[in-house]
Amino acid sequence: MEYLQITSFDDYRVEEIYKSYCETFPEDERRSEQQFRHLFSNPRVKVFSVLKDLKNIGYLISWELTNFVFIEHFEIFSEFRSLKYGSEIISHLYKNYSHIVLEAEPEDQDENAARRISFYEKNGFMVIDDNYVQPCYDPEKNSLNLWLLANWKPEKTDWIKEEIYDVVYC
């Protein structure tokens, strides 16, 4: 598997990534096109296209924060799901980052959310905050009640949430 960092919104892969991003994530869970474009000029953000056998199979959007990496979005394109690629990507992340944090819908939201939580737990993540609120991306969108997961058990989560709120959603 290859991980190609995309450094420009004009990269041809971004069209496929952004299209899938808009189709997969509900409007309240995603950035506008302008906000997405700005990710590429932020030095803390890394957008990766994930390739398997020279095919784009998905992407990661990560934020390198003070003491952890925050995975804002992680998607395997629909035609490549259920092939264990997600677990391979998580394994790759573990090799590169000791502390990883991400958000997910509560498992009682629907069957897909329950599967997603199960996937993350099987891959070493645990729920560290089940009262987490994802701030809205802009005033026309809603904040969301999500779960915060990590691959380690911090004593407190306030500092994690504070940095996510101040850097990712500012």
Language-model regions: role of each:
Residues 45, 143-148:
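Short hydrophobic/aromatic beta-strand or adjacent loop that forms the aromatic wall/cage
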Residues 49, 55-75:
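Conserved beta-strand in the GNAT
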Residues 1-31, 145-146, 155-170:
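Short amphipathic alpha-helix that is part of the acyltransferase structural core
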Residues 76, 82-95:
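Conserved acetyl-CoA-binding loop-helix of GNAT-fold acetyltransferases
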Residues 96-112, 117:
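Conserved GNAT acetyl-CoA-binding A-motif
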Residues 103, 117, 121-141:
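Conserved catalytic-core motifs of GNAT/GCN5-like acyltransferases
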Residues 24-52:
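Active-site rim helix/loop that mediates acceptor-substrate recognition in acyltransferases
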